[in-house]
From Swiss-Prot:
It comes from Saccharolobus solfataricus (strain ATCC 35092 / DSM 1617 / JCM 11322 / P2). Gene3D superfamilies: Isopropylmalate Dehydrogenase. Substrate binds at R86, R96, R117, D201. This is 3-isopropylmalate dehydrogenase. It is found in: Cytoplasm. The gene is leuB. The lineage of its organism: Archaea, Thermoproteota, Thermoprotei, Sulfolobales, Sulfolobaceae. One of its GO terms (cellular component) is cytoplasm. Mg(2+) binds at D201, D225, D229. The record marks Y124, K170 as: Important for catalysis. Homotetramer. GO terms for molecular function: 3-isopropylmalate dehydrogenase activity; isocitrate dehydrogenase (NAD+) activity; magnesium ion binding; NAD binding. It catalyses: (2R,3S)-3-isopropylmalate + NAD(+) = 4-methyl-2-oxopentanoate + CO2 + NADH. Catalyzes the oxidation of 3-carboxy-2-hydroxy-4-methylpentanoate (3-isopropylmalate) to 3-carboxy-4-methyl-2-oxopentanoate. The product decarboxylates to 4-methyl-2 oxopentanoate.
Amino acid sequence: MTFRVAVIPGDGIGPELYEGSKRIIAKLIEKYNLDIDLIEVEAGDVALNKYGEALPRHTLDVIEKADMILKGPVGETAMDVVVKLRQMYDMYANIRPAKSLPNVQSKYPNVDLVIVRENTEDLYKGFEFVTSTGVTIAIKVTTEFASKRIVNVALNYALMRRRKVTCVHKANVMRVTDGLFASVCREILKGKVNFEEMYVDAAAANLVRDPTRFDVIVTSNVYGDILSDEASQIAGSLGLAPSANIGDRKSMFEPVHGAAFDIAGKGIANPTAFLLSVSMMLSRMYELSKENKYILASKSLENAIIETYKSGNKLTEDVGGSAKLKDMVDEIYKYM
C-alpha cells in the first residue's frame, strides 16, 4: 500500500523545518523503497489570514483522503487546527516519548519512557457551565470504552519495550471517574506486564526524583497533558519532544514545541522534534503494514539523530552548539 501523508508545514519555524527535512525524508524513501506520497497543505495562522479559516476546505479535502498527517508547529490557531483534527478523526491516543539525548544537559542522562494519554475525554471534553454569578462547573467524563481502548494501547507499547506499565490516577479522591479508569487498568494489565498504580501527585514527584523507574505510563487526558510536558523537560528539553496522535482511521505526528516566531527565518531552529515525529510516523506505518522497511527506516532516522548528538559537532544553539538548521540536517543525513 502507498501511504498518503498530508503535510502541514505550519507557521513560524515550521516551514523551514519541513523544507530542511525534505532531503532526509527523500533519502529514507529512496534507501528503503518506502511507498509514501507527501502532499503539502495549508493550515494555521497563514491559512487564516489568507482564507479566513485556519483549516480551509481544500485542506480538509486532502486530509480526508490521506492516511496520516505530518504537522509542523502552528501559531495562535493551534487549538483550531490540532484539537479540531483530533476530534474529527477520533485520535484517541496521545503518545509522548521522553528520551534523553547525548550531550543534552539534564540531571538524568538515561531517561527512556513513554506516556500514553487518553485524548478524547476527561475535563477536556469541554463541558463547562456558569451556574450562577461567581459559580462555574466542569464535567469530568470517563467511559469504560475509552479507558479500555487507551489501556490496550499502553499494553502494546509495554510489550515492545521493558514490559512495565504504571497506571496514573487519583482514585482516592475521584472515586467514581478515576476509580473506573483504575479498575480497567487492573483488569487488562495485571498478569500481562509488570503493573503498578500511582496517584498523579506521586507520579509527578517520582518523575523528578527518578524518571528511570518508569517505562510506560498510561493515564487520563488532563494528568497526561501535564505529566508529558514534565517528562519531556526532565529528559532534556520540551523543544526536543515529538508526539503522535493515534486514531484507528487517521493519525497525526507533530513536534511538541511551538512556532517560535522570534527565530523564524533565521535558519537556527532545531529539527530534532520534527524529525523524531517523522520517525514515529514511520513506526506507525510499520504497525499498519507489517512491512519491515518502515521500522528499519524509523530506527535509521532515530539512530542518525542520536549519533549526531553523540558527536556534538553540529548542534544548534538551543542545545549548546553553534550550527545552523542546515548544518544539523546535513550531519543527520551523513549518519544515515
